[in-house]
Amino acid sequence: MSKIAGKRLVYFPNITFTLCRGLNLQPKFAVFRVPLHVNKFDVRDYLQHVYNLKVVSVKSRIYQGKLFRNQLGQVKRPQSEKRVIVEMEEPFVYPNAPNDLKDWQEGELLPDGSNVKTLSRYPKVLEQVDMKRVNEELSKLQDKQILESQQKIARLLKKKY
């Protein structure tokens, strides 16, 4: 039977752990961005039970957002973020990012459902939905309710824009 040191019993985790890449750390260390309410024990239990990683130590730090003035001149601060540095028993090496995307033609979907155009880290323009293609696919289905909902959506889109 395993011991649980954290406060919460996590059966199906609803906590998002974001692995931060690009920091100059030794291979036994990894940095995660976690919600503010997560503590060190929760991090250790999560990594141990979900990913079966043996954690040696956990160090956490809260980074405050920089102050700025909005358009009304009010001083605001964005939400703080918590980063956790985890030391593991076994070294961890990041997988290499793919350099060549020739296997996928532009416009085709990748196995995860994303588009080749949206693979850049910070996309400048969001991809526009091709309504003609959507309407053609819906018209292939001869369901009366779908056709009615398609017409309602088209009317709503015309009203807004």
Curated annotation (Swiss-Prot):
The transit peptide of this chain lies at 1-34
* InterPro entries per the UniProt record, alphabetical: Nucleotide-bd_a/b_plait_sf, Ribosomal_uL23-like, Ribosomal_uL23/eL15/eS24_sf
Gene Ontology, cellular component aspect: mitochondrial large ribosomal subunit; mitochondrion
Keywords per UniProt:
Mitochondrion, Ribonucleoprotein, Ribosomal protein, Transit peptide
Write down the Pfam families for this protein, in alphabetical order: Ribosomal_L23
Does the keyword field hold tRNA processing? no
Q: Which GO terms describe its molecular function?
A: structural constituent of ribosome
* UniProt keyword annotation of Mitochondrion present: yes
Name the predominant localization. mitochondrion
Instruction: Give its localization.
Output: Mitochondrion
What's the domain of life for this entry? Eukaryota
**Disulphide bridges in this chain?**
none
SUPFAM superfamilies the record matches: Ribosomal proteins S24e, L23 and L15e
What Gene3D superfamilies does the record tag this protein with?
3.30.70.330
Q: Name one GO biological process term.
A: mitochondrial translation
Role played = Component of the mitochondrial ribosome (mitoribosome), a dedicated translation machinery responsible for the synthesis of mitochondrial genome-encoded proteins, including at least some of the essential transmembrane subunits of the mitochondrial respiratory chain. The mitoribosomes are attached to the mitochondrial inner membrane and translation products are cotranslationally integrated into the membrane.
Q: Which family does it belong to?
A: Belongs to the universal ribosomal protein uL23 family.
Q: How does it assemble?
A: Component of the mitochondrial large ribosomal subunit (mt-LSU). Mature yeast 74S mitochondrial ribosomes consist of a small (37S) and a large (54S) subunit. The 37S small subunit contains a 15S ribosomal RNA (15S mt-rRNA) and at least 32 different proteins. The 54S large subunit contains a 21S rRNA (21S mt-rRNA) and at least 45 different proteins. uL23m forms the wall of the exit tunnel. Interacts with the C-terminus of OXA1.
Q: What is this protein called?
A: Large ribosomal subunit protein uL23m
Question: What organism is this sequence from?
Answer: Schizosaccharomyces pombe (strain 972 / ATCC 24843) (Fission yeast)
